Regions:
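Short, hydrophobic secondary-structure boundary micro-motifs
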Residues: 29, 165-166
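Residues at the C-termini of beta-strands that transition into short coil/loop
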Residues: 60, 168-170
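A structural preference for short, hydrophobic beta-strand core positions in alpha/beta folds
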Residues: 131, 166-168
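Radical SAM enzyme core and accessory elements
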Residues: 159-161, 171-175
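Conserved AdoMet/S-adenosylmethionine-binding subsite of the radical SAM
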Residues: 2-160
Length: 175
């Protein structure tokens, strides 16, 4: 996993993907390569148009415009409607399902209502949702969701037929 938004460095990301997947490079299958993005809508469409068939992971974290803009500045310039449309476009061109990354933050995006909105946002095409336990940083205002709310959130998605995983925080014992 690298740092920064890869789709804002498109030309070099495409070069890197070519190296990773070419015989002269690492010779990995595109099926084993995942590109993680915060959701630059026009570049997601460009990936599809350029026939780049990588697995796409979207850092979503909220399906409320207001909340997403607060926790992810990219939300201010890429609306959820535009984002959903670009992901549908990507799927229609590549037939690759999208993985949604969703960090559960206590009392910010972890309610049953948030789970219902997430399901509604993702149900239009095959996808997977990775719920991520927040790794608390004491100098930040965010807290991880409670076990009870996490279970309710995940149970709702599972009962709705969503392919969902919970990624637990690791390294809690490290100072």
């Amino acid at each position: 996993m690298g740092m920064g938004e890869p789709l804002l460095n498109y030309k070099n990301v495409i070069k890197a993907l070519h190296y990773i997947t070419s015989e002269e490079g690492l010779n990995m299958s595109y099926k084993r390569v995942t590109l993680s993005t915060s959701g630059i809508t026009k570049m997601i469409k460009k990936l599809a148009d350029d026939k780049v068939k990588v697995n796409l992971a979207l850092s979503l974290h909220s399906v409320s415009e207001e909340t997403r803009e607060k926790i992810m500045p990219v939300g201010k310039s890429n609306s959820l409607i535009e984002l959903r449309d670009s992901l549908k476009y990507y799927f229609s061109k590549t037939k690759k399902k999208v993985t949604y990354e969703y960090v559960l933050l206590r009392d910010i995006n972890d309610s049953l209502e948030d789970a219902k909105k997430l399901y509604k946002f993702t149900k239009h095409m095959p996808s997977k949702i990775n719920l991520i336990e927040y790794n608390e940083v004491y100098s930040l205002k965010f807290q991880k969701s409670t076990e009870e709310k996490t279970k309710i959130f995940m149970d709702y998605l599972e009962k709705s037929g969503v392919n969902v995983n919970l990624r637990r925080s690791r390294g809690k014992d490290i100072n």
